[in-house]
Amino acid sequence: ILLHILLLLSGCSGRNTPPTGQEVTVWFQNNEEDLNTVRDYLATLDFDSMDIKDSKMIVGYTYIISYTYISESQLNKTRLPIREDTVLLALRSLRKAGCKNTYYSRNTLQYCIWRGTSSIDCGVAYRADGQMPDIAYLTQCEPLEVDGWYWYVADFEEWRVRNAG
């Protein structure tokens, strides 16, 4: 069953709907230590936004960077290496467990663990202040059993239809 859930979350099954809250909860429970390691490390840094790529962070810009023209030299100035071995190991472990992206913006830390073919993603999010996570195109969000942690679905098309007019 665990292998099936991991395959679903990693997108290996060709699944075109997001995982259920129960599936995300199981993923969270299996990866909680690594999630907390990364969360605790990022809490020590003083940046408004961060997008983690492998062993480096892009700071000052969020994952929407691909939609905004930024010169390579400007981007290089914003790349910071992660030198903490425990954090690097946690990031590698999360990637192996199906985590697609890790980013922080608007007081919300997001771990995207599933991405659909049409502007849908799903994962876990953390917000220390007890507020609901601030995630673009949020359509579902429920608290997990651990304070500050939530599972979410962000679906642009569903969000657009709900907010039309």
Give the positions of each predicted feature.
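Bacterial N-terminal signal peptides
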Residues: 1-8
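Context-gated lysine
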Residues: 1, 53-56, 77, 96, ...
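Secretory pathway export signals and precursors
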Residues: 8-9, 95
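Functionally constrained cores in energy, signaling, and assembly domains
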Residues: 4, 39, 142-145
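N-terminal export/targeting and maturation segments
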Residues: 12-88
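Extracytoplasmic electrostatic interaction patches
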Residues: 87-165
